[in-house]
Amino acid sequence: MVKVYAPASSANMSVGFDVLGAAVTPVDGALLGDVVTVEAAETFSLNNLGRFADKLPSEPRENIVYQCWERFCQELGKQIPVAMTLEKNMPIGSGLGSSACSVVAALMAMNEHCGKPLNDTRLLALMGELEGRISGSIHYDNVAPCFLGGMQLMIEENDIISQQVPGFDEWLWVLAYPGIKVSTAEARAILPAQYRRQDCIAHGRHLAGFIHACYSRQPELAAKLMKDVIAEPYRERLLPGFRQARQAVAEIGAVASGISGSGPTLFALCDKPETAQRVADWLGKNYLQNQEGFVHICRLDTAGARVLEN
């Protein structure tokens, strides 16, 4: 039996639309991510468990884990009879890389079960392909950090899909999921087809400056440059209370904040534990909309997807 855990991730990080993402893990030790188990069997089967299992498609072939198994078998050129179990701990359409968690855990578990026939680069390419079936286009800003850990910059040149960017140990990521769903496809459709020249220049300056600040170890500068002129101005209308929440967490002391992925999760970066707790308390009282919402104080998950049992 192989059991793989794949962590939540926060894509875009305001400054890097479709090209930056970070894997995150709660500081209290909770597992914020999906778990997939693979066991040898006579025929294929898929069982769904976990807090958000009831939100998965009722038709097994529509489940992304089934599609991962099917695509992995196609890649190897043979049918691999296994019993798979998806522990769905991540809310769907949350902006926390929910589909990426399932895809990464499923493909990594299949690869481990079969003796690692695929290298990490090929496996990551498959992960991007499968995640793209849900989001509507292939992009790696969730699957890459989820699989490899840390903060990842998408390269997609010279057979390099992504490379790690150094993060800051003092940064605490407060993630607030309000309990509502935002479709990634819908959040992409709301974006303009073309952008003004000054917005393109600002975006390039912010992203280049952010990467420079990470490598030159300037956390204050990095946080200041986490600005979004590409998606947030258009997507915030999909997120009730987002603008007020951003203003509130800034007043409390967050050094940066924005939309995690395509939302509705809000992320707020803090450089002090007491500030992070105050931000988390405010968001828990004011940004959550129902019982399914949650707030976690997290750090970067530098390990990425990992085998829990083998």
Curated annotation (Swiss-Prot):
| This protein's record includes keyword Transferase | yes
Q: Where in the cell is it found?
A: Cytoplasm
Cellular component GO terms, alphabetical: cytosol
Q: Result of mutating H206Q?
A: 3500-fold decrease in kinase activity
Q: Where does ATP bind?
A: P91, I92, G93, S94, G95, L96, G97, S98, S99, A100, C101
Q: In which pathway does it act?
A: Amino-acid biosynthesis; L-threonine biosynthesis; L-threonine from L-aspartate: step 4/5
Q: Does the keyword Protease apply?
A: no
UniProt xrefs under Pfam families: GHMP_kinases_C, GHMP_kinases_N
Functionally, this protein is described as follows: Catalyzes the ATP-dependent phosphorylation of L-homoserine to L-homoserine phosphate. Is also able to phosphorylate the hydroxy group on gamma-carbon of L-homoserine analogs when the functional group at the alpha-position is a carboxyl, an ester, or even a hydroxymethyl group. Neither L-threonine nor L-serine are substrates of the enzyme.
Give the protein name, as stated in the record.
Answer: Homoserine kinase
